[in-house]
Amino acid sequence: MNQDVRVFPDSIYLSCSKKKASLRIDRVDGCLSLSNSLDLSKTPDYNNVQLYGFIRLKIYKYVVLVTSCDLHAAILGNNIYRARKFAIFPITRTLPFSTGLLNIKDEEELHYISLLNKHLSKGQILFSPTLDLTCSLQRLRVLTQSFELTSKYNYRFFWNKYAFHELIELTNKDLGFQEWIQPMIQGNIAITNSFLKTYNLRLCVITRHSPDYAGTRYFTRGVNAQGSAANFNEIEQIIMIESPITLEEQMVLSFTQIRGSIPMFWAEVNDLHYRPLLSLQPLDYSETVFGKHFQELANDYGDNLVVVNLLDQKGREAPLRSGFEKLCKRNKNPPLSYVYYDYHKQGSRNLPLFLAEIQSLLIEGKYYAEHGSKTTAMQTNFVRTNCMDCLDRTNVIQTSIAQFILNMQLHDIGVLSSSESLEEYDSFLQDFRLIWANTGDYISDLYTGTPALKGDVTRHGTRTIFGAFKDLLNCFRRYILNNFFDGMLQDSYDLGLGVFRPYDSLSIPDLPLRFHWTRFVAPGIFLFTTIILTIQELFGNPSLFCRLLYSIPMVNAGIYLYFHRRQYVNWPRLVLPTYAKGGWFSFRNHFRNITLKVFRFLRSGSFKKSV
């Protein structure tokens, strides 16, 4: 936050005392260049800002600045800031720089600006001037200065990479642009300081949310054509043991886990049902992107990937579980270590059995460790966990794995003796559980709009009545948000992350979305007649005529709402979900599914689906 902005009639300059050259933005064509001829005698129009990037909408190109931030945390001497306020300014000579947004008359452009503001205000955007937050500690240590710029950043978690794509391309020609690129993450950093025996321990959990297929719960499921999984997160647990003598002797241990949606073509289609229709494409359609997804994971994390599947063995999740299991066993590049645990059947009481099953893989894979400036161990096995949403069940399992690793780390470095266990220290264990529960809540809020379910298991290690009641309320909130509000939020993701680019769009969506008053007639009739009938039954003795007078329109309105329920879902307007534009529910697709069922019946005498 030490950058200044100076506005001139034909250009805009960003300067910083710590940078060799100023960044010049041409107000005619929006081109970026480096300049050493800035007149610093001119008072800055804006000071103490941080460049977020540049985004072009339908008419104008804009510079996005962080104008206010808070100190969020400090890790290994590096300050981490959270962006609190943003400012969006048009890059053009036809509008005043500071008040340009007030002079924009185009309704569609204003709607895009509103969506961009919504995108910037969602979640937590974190950055550090001295630490690349896109990389885990292990990745940072293995990088060398000989790598090019594009190899330094971990683009999987570079949240504002679309806003910086122009500068990144220019860096390939002139490395001077590199110092103006500030990678930011959408994520959370939770830190707690604890005292264990005679040791001062600092526990930190860093969450990195991937921008590659980001969005809301029902509009981003499965995997996209590029092999990027929905709701993909990297969670790094760092434990720092302070030396009483010198900082150089500090021990730092970290363990990284990942989670993401099942990398297959599948969806749950919003239709106002509490559990929407689950649609799964044939496995052959998903095999290519499945392999691409895990190949990219192998490139980032190595070939030793452990896949933990928490889907139900029976019920509506069974076809998805079976298909995922088959693809895992088919995949040979890289080969996957597959572990299955039916959480809803086994529950949290059998977690020790699950940990015993993967114990050898965790011990073999180790963790990253450094003592002072020397690296003493490297993590070689990485666990990828998923359930249906990669939220509630996944939180419980990843917390259990993290606790197992923490126990192992503290034993290895001598903080705990071989006969001791972390479970014996209630105060430290409570801090550990709280920090992981908050991490789960953050990821869940990004994806669903509510804290995670089963948070009481993460916090207390067992189910509680109060926790079950909170889950009930959060389920209701999820239903409302996911059905009636997530469409616009998904639009904000697609616009801010470059999935939809207004200047390059051939079809202009109907923005902003307006509902004709006739759409509210049926819900109004249903609600009004239901209230009247309820009042009459509770406080009066209505005649048959009165009952029929209100019951008939109520039933008709209810039937209309049932058969037109998808029209009342808040759908995205910029980019339709894959299943909505890919013919998943076309007559041809239904005919194919019916044909497959008939074929199964003729072959095995059963309509039961075998995935």
UniProtKB/Swiss-Prot annotation:
Pfam families in the record: Syja_N (PF02383)
GO terms for biological process, alphabetical: phosphatidylinositol dephosphorylation; sphingosine biosynthetic process
Entry GO terms, CC: endoplasmic reticulum; endoplasmic reticulum membrane; Golgi apparatus; Golgi membrane; serine palmitoyltransferase complex
Domain of life: Eukaryota
GO molecular function per UniProt: phosphatidylinositol-4-phosphate phosphatase activity
Family classification: To yeast RSD1 and S.pombe SpBC19F5.03.
Domain (SAC): residue spans on this chain: 51-351
Classification of source organism: Eukaryota, Fungi, Dikarya, Ascomycota, Taphrinomycotina
PROSITE patterns membership: SAC
Listed name of the protein: Uncharacterized protein C3C7.01c
